[in-house]
Amino acid sequence: MNTKAASAMSEESSEKSALVPRLRFPEFRDAEAWKAAQLDKLISTVTPPKKIPATEYFAKGLFPIIDQGQSDIAGWTDDPSALIKDDEPLIIFGDHTCALKVLREPFAQGADGIKILKGNGPATTEFLYQHLCFRPVLPEEYKRHFSILRDKVIAYPEAKSGEQQKIADCLSSLDDLIMAETQKLDALKTHKKGLMQQLFPREGETVPRLRFPEFQEAGEWAEKSIGDFGEVITGSTPSTARPEFYGGGIPFVSPADISDLRWVNDTKTTLTASGFEEIRPIKANSVLFVCIGSTIGKVTQNIRDCATNQQINSVIPNTEHSGGFLYYALSLNAERIANLAGIQAVPIINKTQFSAVRLPVPELPEQERIADCLSFLDDLITAQSKKIDAFKAHKKGLMQQLFPVVDEVQE
């Protein structure tokens, strides 16, 4: 091999192994390639002065308590001696849960199970936090995961160049935007919850506290059973030994497919036409209620004809009742209905129990008016949720461009 060819191959190999992100801010496009090191070499740990036991978490207080739960704040304390203060932001890692948070204000550590980290020089804390969000440690089981986190290889540019700060600022601004939009979503959900409590009678009462003007003289609501609303169907599962029953375009709803949004459309499992023939079909706009298992009480409506598994009882409304009204009535009473299962290893409400549950019900026009009002709020909630999902997807895509993947470069 001649010298020129060898030189060309060397340059090609060097370019292939260079740690350079696919997207760089204009002022850094001609900057040096990034370096890489294990996270353990880039961080130091912070020891709290004390830990607040879970029994001493307050609902209100002067200082936030942070633990390894998914909530940003686990509780509050008034104990200043427990405060962790630092001039730099601090990363919180849930050793069992793998929850990842960044704290920029003083806080107290809750029960054991978190690691408090900060950048020790080559990489800033804010940059490291965003990098760890890009490629997080995923919980495998209930065990400690810090050793896995510590061994992660992190790619980083020179801190003094300002590129780390630029990336962190860009992604943090998206985090702030997502947080602001999430607060709007929470406000909509809170407003809807309060409105539902006003539009339906309290337990033991027959008239709601808030009524639309055209129904204020309509009289008391009647008490009816869920079975009065229409046909109640308990779901079933086609034989899993028959692969020809699965993988079609017909939704097969399980509790895992039901979110806190009103409608279910896409499901993890689908049925073929032949699989659909094996079960009792659930017509579109029916009301689906989980009656077995740990998620008992989840409720939804189906946008199109579907099937459900045996954990779900579905109500196909008759012409005298509104499916939307029943959905909101069951949502409001979900906890009360779930309590019918009592305490047992696998909570269950059978079809007879479920069908016999009594609910206050107005005439059909008022049912529809209530459903339309709350449906409008649900549309706002759905739109806001999609907006947040779009911002999260944008951030994820941006991180894929801003951070080089060490494994890909080294191949």
Model-derived segments and their meaning:
Residues M1-A37, P157-E220, A356-E411:
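Amphipathic alpha-helical coiled-coil/heptad-repeat segments
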Residues M1-A8, L39, I91, T97-S161, ...:
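Basic, amphipathic alpha-helical recognition segments used for DNA target recognition
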Residues V20-K50, A59-S71, R211-S236, D260:
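Non-catalytic DNA-recognition/assembly elements of restriction-modification systems
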Residues F245-D260:
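Short beta-strand/loop turn elements enriched in aromatics
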Residues T272-E278:
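Short alpha-helix capping/helix-loop boundary micro-motifs
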